Amino acid sequence: MIKTVALVSLSAGTIGEDFVKHEVNIGLKRLEQFGLNVKIMPHAMKGIEYVKNHPKERANDLLAAICDEEVDMILCAIGGDDTYRLLPYLFENNELKEAIEKAEKRKIFLGFSDTTMNHLMLHKLGFGTFYGQSFLADVCEMEDDMLPYTKKFFEELIKTGNIKEIVPSDVWYEERTDWSESAVGTERTKHENEGFQLLQGKPVFAGKILGGCLESMYDIFDNSRYPDTISLCEKYNLFPSLEDWRGKILLLETSEEQPDPKHYRKMVET
């Protein structure tokens, strides 16, 4: 049973901005309603510019959360596009390895999108993670409650420390166009979901998941977003080896960038 959650901003520092204060307040209240204590790590609420310009402080927040014996879960605030910049501050002097070894209990690490890079960093050191909800995108949902599918799995994770079975949602939702405080309590437009599309193989399978956001993983091999992604990811050997992938369920999700089919194919083939 999860009791204490550490909130970290390892990518964008959005939750420190005034324009999302109403969402953040909703999310913090929801976590408390789940019976959770919330620890906001020192730099998580510093805002977009500060967080962007201080990757070392982001890394320090992660290390502190891992070492904090009161913390049961590390919840990422939101994605972004540059959490790869934490690599030198986590691996150059074995900082992350030592923090994991120092921690006396297993912690849940949760997030998605650019957080893929953090998942791969932790995977590299044998620290199992869960690819799932982020604080701002999911817990802070502006409807009167979290979306049912999202809430179901979040509750299962905080109550049991695991996810037993993943089934498709009955519905899918359109993204909001109004994120202002006046939109609090309004429902998203939803549509019936037809479920998973089976291309080949057995319809039911089990195993460990490895993967994440396609654009983030593509950045490991492409410098078009930032000039140093390839060099940093190569230096610290971030991408999993062929042996790591053996027997895993490949997870790929695309971001709000909505790549066209040609670019999608290029990213997958890379």
How would you describe each model-predicted region?
Residues 11-15, 78-83, 110-117, 257:
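Gly/Ser/Thr-rich loops at beta-strand to alpha-helix junctions
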Residues 75, 110, 249-253:
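Structural motif
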Residues 67-94:
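Long, hydrophobic/aromatic-enriched structural stretches that serve as scaffold segments
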Residues 222-270:
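Internal helical hairpin/lid segments
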Residues 128-215:
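Conserved anion/nucleotide-ligand pocket segment
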Residues 121-124, 210, 215-217, 243:
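Hydrophobic structural segments
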